[in-house]
Amino acid sequence: MTAEQTSRRALPRHYAVSMLYEHLGARPRIHDTAVIAPTAVVSGDVEIGAGCQVLHGAVITAEGGPITLGTHVIVMENALVRATAANAVRIGDHTLVGTLASIAGATVGEEVFLASGARVFNGAIVGARSEVRVNAIVQRRARVPEGTVVPIGWVAVGDPLQLFSPDRDAEIAAAQPDLDFPGHVFGVDRDTPDLMVQLTERYGSSLARHADDLPLGDARG
């Protein structure tokens, strides 16, 4: 029996056919009672707790930093959860991540509702029992207190938190003058004359490490 066949047999039936990958030497750790859809991708240093549901098309990828899902977390269709070396992800118990929502390098508390299309960016913290409604954005390093509602399409910025409607672009920028997106997320100086050349080459080099990922499951069973 090959090592690949052995690894497949070691996986419980309810996620043995999912797309699971070892990345940078780390493998997903999935509770026996969690259910991962066959077309979901789980890659790298990811821990998924009891009773979690990860639906079709969802991607949970630990790219240098860990991802931890508590118990009874639901990740809906085509949602994205991504950690980086600089920003881990933690999602608390009984939280729902809606269809097409994304969490990048952020901490989300327990019993949080992230509606369809919601975005939570690097370094942000969303407190327990909060709601980030349809297409709303929690910006980098924002701190959303417990029980906060971020309205549909609005933008949450800063610590202490400020909430802005999307038409107030100048105020949103003014509320976060020290946030350096290229530097914080990609390690590239914003003022460099070839910013996008450096950004795409550096980030592409990091992403290229997925070429060495080891498949742990077969979507065909």
Predicted feature residues:
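Short, conserved structural micro-motifs that define repeat-unit consensus positions
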Residues: T71-V73, G92-T95
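Glycine-rich hexapeptide-repeat left-handed beta-helix
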Residues: A3-G25, R29, E63, E77-N78, ...
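A positional/architectural concept
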Residues: I30, A34-G70, I74-A83
